[in-house]
Amino acid sequence: MKPSKLFNPFEEIAGAKALFFGFVVMLITGLTGYFSFTHFPDMISIKYIPEYLPLSYYFVQQVVIWLIPSLIFYVFALIGSSSSVRVVDIFGTMALARFPYIIAAVLGFSGSMKRFGDYLMALFMEHDTTATISTFDIVTAIVVMFLMLLLTVWLVALMYNAFRISSNLKGGKAVGLFIAGLFISIIATMLVNIWLYGLWA
Amino acid sequence: MEKKLPIMCPGCGGSLMVKSLYCESCETTISGSFSLPLFLKLGQKEQDFIMEFVQSSGSLKQMAKSLKLSYPTVRNMLDDLIEKITQLKTEDL
């Protein structure tokens, strides 16, 4: 596979095919997240919350972080593009763009993140100077955090290409509308997820 | 090797005109100043795209399948081509 395809598979896959694979991606991410306690509190964030919540919550969360941005980017594409924009292209490519977060959900299985979080909480919030953590956990937690940062960059690049290809927007117009859409989507998905968490937790 | 028809001047980048036409069978040469047809002012890839489009009976879905590209990618190529043709037509006026 060419490296460019990792960031832009949409030149070859879009529409209903992308939507189908996107749903598979969301199912796998939701299911893996359920077992690894990995949450996606907004469109791009990854959070580890070791608290039992039903499987349906994880699936609904996946739908929320896909549906809201897709809707926002579809409206922006209609506003900015002179081409005919198909709903299935925006929603399909946006769903498929979420595939890097399968890895994020798998990374949630690393117990080091939890232990590192507990250590920081004890040290800075509870001022417990007796709190300890192994060097292995610190190194693993830092590596996992770095990987998650890379996954976020990968996701944003994929979403930008999904938006650009589906709407036939170029240059500054594409970048400007994408940044605006991204910003609104993050806030909207975050607010809906807070409400969702309140319903389930 | 198939020669490529130059459409831009290598010296200044301006549009080229046809100055003479030659008949291979009777060796007649016609001189004058003829502008290139719009189709020939397009690049090779764009000409190939138009040919493919016609051969696919204007179906972008069929074209996407044969080119192994997604539908929006092919539609974007067509939109860009329409824009270029409009631009060339405006320049000709």
Which role fits each region the language model picked out?
Chain A
Residues K5-V25, V88-F99, G172-I179:
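Alpha-helical transmembrane segments and their helix-start/interface "positive-inside/aromatic belt" motifs
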Residues G22-G30, Y58-L71, M94-R98, I102, ...:
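Alpha-helical transmembrane spans of integral membrane proteins, capturing the lipid-embedded, hydrophobic core
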